[in-house]
Amino acid sequence: MEIVGCRAEDNSCPFRPPAMLFHGISGGHIQGIMEEMERRSKTEARLAKGAQLNGRDAGMPPLSPEKPALCAGCGGKISDRYYLLAVDKQWHLRCLKCCECKLALESELTCFAKDGSIYCKEDYYRRFSVQRCARCHLGISASEMVMRARDSVYHLSCFTCSTCNKTLTTGDHFGMKDSLVYCRAHFETLLQGEYPPQLSYTELAAKSGGLALPYFNGTGTVQKGRPRKRKSPALGVDIVNYNSGCNENEADHLDRDQQPYPPSQKTKRMRTSFKHHQLRTMKSYFAINHNPDAKDLKQLAQKTGLTKRVLQVWFQNARAKFRRNLLRQENGGVDKADGTSLPAPPSADSGALTPPGTATTLTDLTNPTITVVTSVTSNMDSHESGSPSQTTLTNLF
């Protein structure tokens, strides 16, 4: 877009200064100013004519009185001294506007043409940009920095958690569901809300056709080829599954899936082994409270060295197995899976009752000489056992 020179005539430029009102200037000075302006206009006309003869003004065709140019905007004749040349057409200064926002483009450095219409830079990228932000659905210019997640592209300011609007940067862990981005904390909350604790991993996979809610990391894209082993099993956990039975002489394992793969590929599972003192602590507290709150989980995490997430899932699966064992006990008292008899519920006179005011505190859970109170059902009495290794809670798993 260029501002093209004045109209060319044979001898002089037709420009004449309009009548002006001068204050405080004598008549002689006014006459001198008028003569100087006329002299300059004649000089400009001679230079323009010489440039045209030398072929240096091929891109700026002058307007001649014989064949006046027509404005591409309004269709009228261009009689102004200056006009605009854009997309090989002549325009009045006032007629070159964006067709969307009506912004005058005479002072802009660039303008865009599409299907015969003129656009400013912002409207052109908004309407015809190749890529759009998956959050605000506005165009992304080629010079902007973006964040990529799966097949979606986001502005840096739009790559935030859909729940808390926390800005996610490179290296942060996040999750995606239905093209929405979540930070790690709210993604875990979303997982817990969608999948009830009593459902196991196999039931979830059978219902949903495979888990489709993996964690992502801002430093990379979707993994291709052979999966990598994770250094820390606590990172990138999708669903944690409690495996087999609890035994003090054998270590328990939590199965952790990596990113989901098609059924034709084999999935590798990361296993976390519990140490004996960790198992004793968790079992002892489970005998007191089947559903610990956040404060109790924090204390257990400090005592066992496990994360709150691992402890949550262990208690969820322990509660589910405890309920299954109670159902089997009501149906006959025999566990058909392992062929062992479950202990009968204690009667009202089956031992000394533990006073309610002497509940075992969390700091005493690893003491081998403590008294463990086992709660079988809500309407049954508690009884006293000798030590954690002989408690009836162990047989329930």
Curated annotation (Swiss-Prot):
Q: State where it is primarily located.
A: nucleus
Q: Does the keyword Nucleus apply?
A: yes
Q: Where in the cell is it found?
A: Nucleus
Q: Which residues form the LIM zinc-binding domain?
A: 69-130, 131-193
Q: Which GO terms describe its molecular function?
A: DNA-binding transcription factor activity, RNA polymerase II-specific; metal ion binding; RNA polymerase II transcription regulatory region sequence-specific DNA binding; sequence-specific double-stranded DNA binding
GO BP of this protein: cell population proliferation; dorsal spinal cord interneuron anterior axon guidance; female gonad development; gonad morphogenesis; male gonad development; negative regulation of DNA-templated transcription; neuron differentiation; regulation of transcription by RNA polymerase II
Record keywords: DNA-binding, Homeobox, LIM domain, Metal-binding, Nucleus, Repeat, Zinc
UniProt DNA-binding residue ranges:
267-326
Biased composition (Low complexity) is annotated at: 353-364
- The source's superkingdom equals Eukaryota
Alphabetical list of PANTHER family matching this protein: LIM/HOMEOBOX PROTEIN LHX (PTHR24208), LIM_HOMEOBOX PROTEIN LHX9 (PTHR24208:SF95)
Question: What is this protein for, i.e. what is its function?
Answer: Involved in gonadal development.
Oligomer status and interactors: Interacts with LDB1 and LDB2.
Protein's UniProt name: LIM/homeobox protein Lhx9
